[in-house]
Amino acid sequence: MKNEIIERFTSYVKVDTQSDENNENCPSTPGQLTLANMLADELKSIGMTDITVDDNGYVMATLPANTDKDVPTVGFLAHVDTATDFTGKNVNPQIIESYDGHDIVLNDKLNVVLSPEQFPELSRYKGQTLITTDGTTLLGADNKAGIAEIMTAMAYLIKHPDIKHGTIRVAFTPDEEIGRGPHKFDVGRFNAAFAYTIDGGPLGELQYESFNAAAAKLTCYGKSVHPGTAKNKMVNASKIAMEFHHALPKEEAPEYTEGYEGFYHLLSMNGDVSEAALSYIIRDFDRDRFAERKEYMQKTADALAAKYGNESIKLELRDQYYNMREKIEPVKEIVDVAYQAMKNLDIDPIIEPIRGGTDGSQLSYMGLPTPNIFTGGQNFHGKYEYISVDHMEKAVNVIVEIARLFEERA
């Protein structure tokens, strides 16, 4: 199975599918549709049915039930796009057989080294087969590992009809990394009782809590005057923006928070004297605290507007997704089945909140409860990203075992 996983995964990552938040089309980049069509062809070749690719790049397919039992339809999802944080063009995956536990030189010329000194968890993978970058791009394990694992699991079930299962639906979605993955996802057409995203990190991750999330854009408007004659006339938009940012709690930022702690995160800033813009994301697990964070931003903007004039400040707040725990807890069995599947395979489940979001965060509020399961990857969204093929194989086995357990329990 390892070679099958490697072949699939390395072919997927070579397609540039980086999404683009500045493009309102769906998918936001043509490479995503290219990969979607490739995946549809592969689904057909392994024996899946009801395969569709719509104009928005959503791939769906069915593995029909091979049992007479009344088993709820389960879905498995992964997203085709890669993050905007680092380039995903010309990905050149490197395969490290029987990792020796020492430094991995990703790129000698650029002196890019994946070291257990900097990334201590790397030592846990000694003896395993790793796939890394060449030091110039991200890898794309987020989330092409999930695609490879779902595809391999479906191929395995088709080749092993002795493993009984209910109807399984598969979907590969666009634009998850820019928060739009489920926006045009047809839950009714997908027609599953519940689903799992295969979009987590290290072995054993099982997640059914996510952030509540919002985006904020602050635009400041100033008055540009020649600096030689600016006294009592100039209003510097960039300084207003700086004042706003410094009013936010310094310790409530990603680099200072963990676990269930929320944050304000400055994504980008640009400007001059006349106009300046700050883009933020707001995150918190608690719904009330989430509301308080948005209110604090609004009050800060209002105070600056009172100081510099109402025309000097514009704050736009937009909710992105909510903590999916609220929708999953009423059907907690789906978490319990995934937990048992891992235990059956001698995998220690790690139940922890997602300090981020998945398609499941939004899908759960669209009527499709969707927890998240590990892929086996580490250091997503950058040149130090890597994944264990051994753990990818375990993810495949978990998918198969989940399908088997639901049939057994029916």
From Swiss-Prot:
Cleaves the N-terminal amino acid of tripeptides. InterPro entries: ArgE/DapE_CS (IPR001261), Bact_exopeptidase_dim_dom (IPR036264), Peptidase_M20 (IPR002933), Peptidase_M20_dimer (IPR011650), Peptidase_M20B (IPR010161). Keywords: Aminopeptidase, Cytoplasm, Hydrolase, Metal-binding, Metalloprotease, Protease, Zinc. Zn(2+) 2 binds at D142, E177, H381. Its cofactor is Zn(2+). It comes from Bacillus velezensis (strain DSM 23117 / BGSC 10A6 / LMG 26770 / FZB42) (Bacillus amyloliquefaciens subsp. plantarum). Belongs to the peptidase M20B family. The keyword Aminoacyl-tRNA synthetase does not apply. This is Peptidase T. Binds 2 Zn(2+) ions per subunit. NCBIfam families: peptidase-T (TIGR01882), PRK05469.1 (NF003976), PRK13381.1 (NF009920). One of its GO terms (molecular function) is metallopeptidase activity. It catalyses: Release of the N-terminal residue from a tripeptide. The lineage of its organism: Bacteria, Bacillati, Bacillota, Bacilli, Bacillales. One of its GO terms (cellular component) is cytosol. Its EC number is 3.4.11.4. It is an enzyme of class 3 (hydrolase). GO terms for biological process: peptide catabolic process; proteolysis. Zn(2+) 1 binds at H79, D142, D199.
